[in-house]
Amino acid sequence: MVSRVWRPFLFGFFAQGHGEIGVPPYETAVISGIGCSSRLPYYMNTYAMQTIHGRAAAIATGFKVANPDITVWQISGDGDGLAIGGNHFIHALRRNVDLNMILLNNRIYGLTKGQYSPTSERGLVTKSSPYGTVEDPFHPAELAFWRPADVFFARCIAVDGAASVEVLKAAANHKGASVVEVLQNCVIFNDGTHASVATKEGRAKNAIYLEHGKPMLFG
């Protein structure tokens, strides 16, 4: 039985995408930090480590430098990856080591029971912001794009399996650092945070699917 803590992106689409990429398990490592997202290594038949809070990007960088022939996937949540781990995230981009960073963004701290995170929307009422957050959120894409041309960035939503798999495959084929932001719901502490693109109808109105070399289509 799959743990209920596992979200749709984790128990289905990552495994499917990894299988379609075709890299064997003994040439793959999955490295995580701390948080709901960070259970992934336990369910992968690959080299894997769950590391300490905020340090996954640094450890993944070291693993890749020491084992250049291994495909490395690093997975974090928005709190793990952009708060305590924000410095390591930025320097992983600066170094542009060939690793794949997945950032599950539900705009909340879920494992610690509902505090606001670096990506929480201004005004969000949480256990740590009872009168609403007074800070503007980080936008992971803006952090990734400060290093032009070299870094791969893509965003998908966890409930869109087909697009998620294609994004993961594109990230894996990129030589250099890749960042995949996965818009993820937290049904307990921040339900509906990505409601505008959570349904097919919503995505038809509010999402633009971009493919390299193809025109942008609106509506």
Map each language-model feature to its residues.
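Solvent-exposed alpha-helices and their adjacent loops that cap or buttress functional pockets
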Residues: S3, I21-P25, T51, K64-P68, ...
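Glycine-rich ThDP/TPP pyrophosphate-binding loop and its adjacent helix/strand module
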Residues: I84-D98, L104, I108-G219
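Active-site diphosphate/adenylate-binding microenvironment
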Residues: M1-I52
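Structural element of the ATP-grasp superfamily
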Residues: F14, G62, A141-A144
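A generic local structural motif
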Residues: Q16-H18, I59-A60, G86-N87, V165-E166
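Thiamine diphosphate
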Residues: I31-G110
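Conserved residues at beta->alpha junctions
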Residues: V5, S76, A158
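Generic structural signal for well-ordered, non-membrane alpha-helical segments
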Residues: S3-F11, I52, A56, T133, ...
